[in-house]
From Swiss-Prot:
This is Small ribosomal subunit protein bS16. It comes from Bacillus velezensis (strain DSM 23117 / BGSC 10A6 / LMG 26770 / FZB42) (Bacillus amyloliquefaciens subsp. plantarum). GO terms for cellular component: cytoplasm; small ribosomal subunit. The keyword Ribosomal protein applies. The keyword Acyltransferase does not apply. GO terms for molecular function: structural constituent of ribosome. The gene is rpsP. Keywords: Ribonucleoprotein, Ribosomal protein. It comes from the Bacteria. PROSITE patterns: RIBOSOMAL_S16. GO terms for biological process: translation. Belongs to the bacterial ribosomal protein bS16 family.
Length: 90
């Protein structure tokens, strides 16, 4: 089972709101998921990002692959740097 960390779209039409979720790569975008890691609201100025850092690092260390957008969000929050440092043993 390949696990991905990706965005699940919520909110009304033309007013998107996303949950950052851990899901099986075979499940649909807005379908079944394993766990919610955070939220992302691109409509708010500035864009609002809330991520549970512990959960995100746990899933990255377990082998979950983040989507491109989630990788960018994690990088802006400093999570990817912490993950790489932990992986290299620093």
């Amino acid at each position: 089972m390949a696990v991905k960390i990706r965005l699940k779209r919520m909110g009304a039409k033309k007013s998107p709101f996303y949950r950052i979720v851990v899901a099986d790569s075979r499940s649909p975008r807005d379908g079944r998921f394993i766990e919610t890691v955070g939220t992302y609201n691109p409509v708010a100025k500035p864009a609002e990002v809330k991520i549970n850092e512990e959960l995100a690092l746990k899933w990255l260390q377990t082998g979950a692959k983040p989507s491109d957008t989630v990788r960018n969000l994690f990088s802006s929050q400093g999570i990817m740097e912490k993950f790489h440092n932990a992986k290299q043993g620093k």
